[in-house]
Amino acid sequence: MSDGACISAATLYRDAVARRRAFRLPGYPTLAEAGFDGDYVSPIQMSSGNLTGPMLISKDWLDAPSAARHHAQLSRTGYLPDNPFNRVIDKVLAMLGLARADIYITPVFHLLVSKRSSTIPPAHARACFKAVGQYELLGRRPVALGTDSARVLRAFGIDHVPAPHPSARIGSFDLRASRIADAVARA
């Protein structure tokens, strides 16, 4: 990528961060309200925020109770290495010979949900993607991790590669990782 394109990507990313900071929906805490505001769209980008790397889009970052319970760890790394989502992502990275710093992970929904595995009304997920997420694409063809993120991307006509959600209750970690790695290779 040329220096001009890098500057453009960085500028677009800063715009997405500002949009995330401004986005609100009643009933959902913001990252700032939970003590996680930073120069990122999602805290997981502290470790997986490569603006030119493969893009993986999930449903949400975390639920508010888990974010509060693990605040110290999340403030350092932006993710919980021992949860199923991240254990599968680590397997994907090993299969592809990549590190977390080589990829970009983001959710379609940038607010905190009330509990683990919460259902986000489709209208809320679309509103957040319209306000924030579409500005993170930066010309990349994303991998949609799970049906929720794929549904949002389809609603906006975004070309993407579908893959199972890393935390889906289907198959083994290895099976999910293999399918996600294949999707990343096709993106």
PLM ranges: what are they?
Residues 122, 179-180:
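Short, hinge-like loop/turn segments at secondary-structure boundaries
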Residues 2-141, 147-149, 154-156, 160, ...:
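A polyanion-binding, active-site-adjacent surface
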Residues 180-187:
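A polyampholytic, Gly/Pro-enriched intrinsically disordered region
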Residues 169-179:
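Short, charged, surface-exposed secondary-structure boundary motifs
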